[in-house]
């Protein structure tokens, strides 16, 4: 039986509700060799500085030794190397763990198995780090929820989610679904491996290592039980145990999530009980980023009424941010009816623009081919994500400002190489800049 057939079998067992057994035997030479060929050899190395190429020189011998240690219970992952990278959209740094290459093989194999076990169990609220799901699907689902009976939104943020996952509680969640002590023990050792901060060893008392091959799925398992199933239970209860009076929805992408509610009392109840629920499992809500707002088809009318009564000076309903976009209430141009629109978060767009302009300034003396290749690679990636329905003004302005910056800095190279706008536009015909046409219809997105 191939690995894919084994994983498919595991998925069927898991879907039936039976605890899955005999998983550790899949951490065999064949699986690890497949993981070896799948891993990117250009990634940073761990504390032992062994590269993929070096490990592969004696691949069979190395894998035989590794499998022997796994079977004998003597495999212990090395501490990861802690580095800090820029956190997208902010000025903050995000910790990242660099595992040794051999440990990356185990992490990747474990992740394959965990995905097979949990994909049949994960609920439809969850979109992050799952096969055949992405950010645009999460956004589309959220838009659909809001276009329904939503009148209130809970925008929430978990403070340092990945760093505060309780190891013992995570293991207990895994044991609900997996009846293989050896496999669970390997995961426990991965969690407890610690990391090096410079040359200083630090115990990992909580959290999953960001950068580990299994970390996203382990975090999804934790949030599945802490948030998703808990919310689903609240939403489905009827009769005397009914928790929500009206329609309620949830969309989660990794640790970012938004709750949508028909009634304010339900939104406030969810917010209040969420704090208690999270505290039980080691999570804390970032109060400055967590709030209940009125949002939906009646938000503008209700705001206008409060303004008429002199209760507020606001003219527009509150907005909220999710996955790089600002969501706001609007009216459809053709019908005048309520609709929800999205636009690029202003601060993030400006920060990205500043990065690109700084690159243009620094590299203005490079060959035009080099400049254009880099810019188009960056812009295509940016537009593939942000060029969605309704966001044409933001991405068009972004592109326009890049072109203006190009004109400015190419004219600073030398008098001999300077352009007027006519000459510059002629040059753009030979070296076109990626256009900002809409790539994704998020109102009718299908996976």
Q: Can you say where each PLM-predicted feature lies in the sequence?
A:
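Short, solvent-exposed helix-loop connector elements
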Residues: 95, 203-208, 338-341, 357-371, ...
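Core structural elements
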Residues: 27-30, 79-81, 88-89, 191-195, ...
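A terminal-accessory region detector
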Residues: 392-447
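Charged, compositionally biased N-terminal leader segments and the immediate start
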Residues: 1-25, 30
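A conserved non-catalytic segment of reverse transcriptases
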Residues: 192, 198, 285-365
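Short, charged alpha-helical motifs in flexible N/C-terminal segments and linkers
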Residues: 36-39, 43-51
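Conserved polymerase palm-domain catalytic core
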Residues: 69-70, 75-84, 121-133, 137-295
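Extended, charge-enriched "interface" segments that sit outside catalytic cores
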Residues: 3-5, 59, 76-78
